[in-house]
């Protein structure tokens, strides 16, 4: 199938959040499965610093009374064709720039639609988040082009109809929706980034005021878990960790723990229970729970704790003050560093992720990949990727709790701390986690089924994953 991904982000050249990871990784795997997948992205001012872009455009268009150009390149590290939408509005050297985002991304979406109508005609346009929400509305006029809309962040829903009416053409049947809701209504298929979150957003607690619409279109709504790049994030070959290891050589992993303790200033003790946390310091990630109970947990146990991340100033200050109370046992790094994050995944015994809500989550999959046992709240994608440890039946991959309460988190962490004492059982738990398949190939198979369902096509024959992953 001919498929065009239209998005505001694409790793590794333009990434702010998880959407960039999806758009940067999924197309290259789908191409190896036989699809002709291409990406349509804004031509940001910083892109020439990150990749080679031909000087001359391949096409010139007109949208919303504006001239624009389209340049063709290749997404670095892949064979995925990349179309770059050129307009002065995207010259600033950052992806999101505040007050003019509604206008910029409506123009971008309109330009993508014109490109598909007049230059390269895909069978499916795969739209991502509110930035591209008008495309399914406009494509409703083109029955030979279908649309898939992926919700990465339901909280941001884009401009409303009254604003869109002033700057572009809106069909009368769009009613009063914002761009997110319009896309949900008019796309041929809608998905979010985990099955559990797809169910949760149909409720008032998670639906961000459009739960009624999401329930109404539930027949075309599904959830597909994101993947991680298992070639880049591989403890057997990771050059950023002190000692490489596999599930069969877990004894080597201890060297990473000692190296991490030395690097972040913790007391060097391979028997200490070391919890890691790599996160944005915001309420969504459960920081209010952590602040309420971490002092009690550190006082009650002999555990160690290391935090890496940035976010709200309040949470940064609170975590910094907590760390000062436990020198040698707690370290806080208020920054983001990919190499250090890998060393935390590889050196920690457990990984804390008590999210208030979590559409998918990547960190818990990274932790499992590197043998760190997740401690998570059962919500969204965490339900779909981490199962509760059952020592009797030798099942599960982590420690889970349900209620968003400090005592529930404290109890769950105590269980993990106590479980760490039983080293043979803990190693089996690590092996189960490391054996989980979080590759993009697994996600790509689900998207392939989704695309085929639009046209009533049968599922594709099984392709050997090793042939695809070997070339990622």
From Swiss-Prot:
EC number annotated for this UniProt entry: 2.4.1.21
Gene Ontology MF terms in the entry: alpha-1,4-glucan glucosyltransferase (ADP-glucose donor) activity; alpha-1,4-glucan glucosyltransferase (UDP-glucose donor) activity
Highest taxon, organism lineage: Bacteria
Pathway: Glycan biosynthesis; glycogen biosynthesis
One record GO biological process: glycogen biosynthetic process
Keywords for this protein: Glycogen biosynthesis, Glycosyltransferase, Transferase
Leading EC class: transferase
Annotated SUPFAM superfamilies: UDP-Glycosyltransferase/glycogen phosphorylase
Catalytic activity: [(1->4)-alpha-D-glucosyl](n) + ADP-alpha-D-glucose = [(1->4)-alpha-D-glucosyl](n+1) + ADP + H(+)
Gene3D superfamilies named among the record's database cross-references: Glycogen Phosphorylase B
Binding of ADP-alpha-D-glucose, residues: 15
Family to which this protein belongs: Belongs to the glycosyltransferase 1 family. Bacterial/plant glycogen synthase subfamily.
Described purpose of this protein according to its UniProt entry: Synthesizes alpha-1,4-glucan chains using ADP-glucose.
Name of the featured protein: Glycogen synthase 2
Lineage start: Bacteria, Bacillati, Cyanobacteriota, Cyanophyceae, Nostocales
Gene (UniProt): glgA2
């Amino acid at each position: 199938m001919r498929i065009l991904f239209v998005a505001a982000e694409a790793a590794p050249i333009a990434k702010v959040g998880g959407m960039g990871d999806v758009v940067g990784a999924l197309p290259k795997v789908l191409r190896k499965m036989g699809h002709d997948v291409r990406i349509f992205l804004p031509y940001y001012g910083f892109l020439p610093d990150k990749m080679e872009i031909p000087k001359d455009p391949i096409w010139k268009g007109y949208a919303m009374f504006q001239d624009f150009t389209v340049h063709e390149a290749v997404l670095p590290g892949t064979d995925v064709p990349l179309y770059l939408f050129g307009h002065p509005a995207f010259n600033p050297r950052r992806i999101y720039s505040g007050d003019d985002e509604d206008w910029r991304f409506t123009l971008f979406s309109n330009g993508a639609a014109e490109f598909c109508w007049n230059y390269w005609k895909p069978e499916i346009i795969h739209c991502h988040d509110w930035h591209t929400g008008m495309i399914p509305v406009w494509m409703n006029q083109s029955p030979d082009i279908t649309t898939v809309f992926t919700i990465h962040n339901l909280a941001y829903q884009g401009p409303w109809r009254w604003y869109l009416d002033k700057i572009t053409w809106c069909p009368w049947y769009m009613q009063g929706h914002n761009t997110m809701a319009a896309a949900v209504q008019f796309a041929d298929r809608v998905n979010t980034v985990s099955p559990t979150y797809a169910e949760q957003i149909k409720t008032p607690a998670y639906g961000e005021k459009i739960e009624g619409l999401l329930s109404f279109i539930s027949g075309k709504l599904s959830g597909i878990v994101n993947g991680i790049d298992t070639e880049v994030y591989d403890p057997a070959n990771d050059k950023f960790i002190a000692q490489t290891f596999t599930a069969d050589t877990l004894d080597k992993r201890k060297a990473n723990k000692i190296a991490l303790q030395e690097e972040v200033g913790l007391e060097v003790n391979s028997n200490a229970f070391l919890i890691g946390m790599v996160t944005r310091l915001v309420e969504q990630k459960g920081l209010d729970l952590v602040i309420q109970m971490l002092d009690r947990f550190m006082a009650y146990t002999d555990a160690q704790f290391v935090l890496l991340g940035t976010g709200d100033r309040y949470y940064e200050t609170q975590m910094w003050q907590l760390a000062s109370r436990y020198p040698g046992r707690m370290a806080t790094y208020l920054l983001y560093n990919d190499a250090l994050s890998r060393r935390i995944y590889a050196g920690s015994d457990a990984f804390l992720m008590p999210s208030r809500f979590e559409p998918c989550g990547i960190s818990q999959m990274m932790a499992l990949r590197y043998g760190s046992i997740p401690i998570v709240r059962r919500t969204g994608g965490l339900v779909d990727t981490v199962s509760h440890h059952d020592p009797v039946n030798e099942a599960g991959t982590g420690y889970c709790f349900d209620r968003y309460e400090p005592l529930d988190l404290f109890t769950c962490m105590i269980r993990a701390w106590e479980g760490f004492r039983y080293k043979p059982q803990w190693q089996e738990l690590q092996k189960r986690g490391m054996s989980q398949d979080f590759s993009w190939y697994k996600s790509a198979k689900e998207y392939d089924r989704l695309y085929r369902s639009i046209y009533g096509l049968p599922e594709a024959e099984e392709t050997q994953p090793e042939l695809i992953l070997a070339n990622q």
